[in-house]
Amino acid sequence: MTDIEIIVPLNVSGIWYPVYTEDIRYTGSIGLSLVLNPPIIVFPKKGEPEIYFNNQHVNFPNLKYLSLLANVKLDIQSEVPLGFGYGLSGAISLAYALASYELYNVKLEDALIIAHESEILTNNGLGDLISEYYGGGLVYRKKPGAPGYGEVEKIIVEWEPICSKPLSKESTEKLIKNKSDNALVYINQFLHNPSLLKFFELSRKFTKELGFVSPFPNSFRKKGLILRLRECEEGWIKHTPAISGAYVH
């Protein structure tokens, strides 16, 4: 087989409502997020399950579950850092699933479920993976769950410049277990009159209630990064909407 590349976009959630069920396939989050470029570019090979991120070996907790699919080594190139809130854990898990499908003919549905479960069981994410799988720019996760079980709706909006600044590496676990009923209120407010600015305004309110404050206008802080609308200064990472989800070529 010729060498393959797997392209997976980033995902930054602005509003989320965790949903835990007895069937892990339907566990996840209802929420709003931005699926963005620049994507990660992943070079998979058959071999001992290992993850190399920008040429550095990383200990990736999800690998405990992902390695049950197949023996895959991933070499990942990324323009954004790991552990700051860009949804990279979900993106890496998704890439591992797609690599298992491509290299070993593992059933795609099974691979996606294991990748989803690896995120849930390590407390690394609830909605990143399904958002990155389908893509769409601004997305609404209507139903929680793995790809094929959850449901994602792509919201059509007029795009403006978006950029981010990574500030600090932080754990996801506390973030996703913080359940706020205001999330559902803000999601409904957004759906009533959707726009990119409205997404930023409501995400700012929601994340501020969780203790994440951004000093910049038209922006919000999610975990260890700030995402900003319109004002993209030097030193910030520029983003475009990832209209397509993850793909292999």
List PLM regions with ranges.
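Short glycine-rich or small-residue beta-strand-to-loop segments that form or flank ligand, phosphate
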Residues: 77-85, 223-229
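DPxDG-like acidic metal-binding loop motif
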Residues: 86-109
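Alpha/beta catalytic cores of group-transfer enzymes, especially the acyltransferase/condensing modules
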Residues: 109-153
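Short hydrophobic-aromatic micro-motifs
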Residues: 5-8, 13-16, 131, 138-141, ...
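Solvent-exposed alpha-helices and their adjacent loops that cap or buttress functional pockets
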Residues: 6-7, 24-25, 33-36, 122-124, ...
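ATP-binding N-lobe of GHMP and related small-molecule kinases
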Residues: 1-82, 235-249
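C-terminal nucleotide
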Residues: 102, 120, 146-249
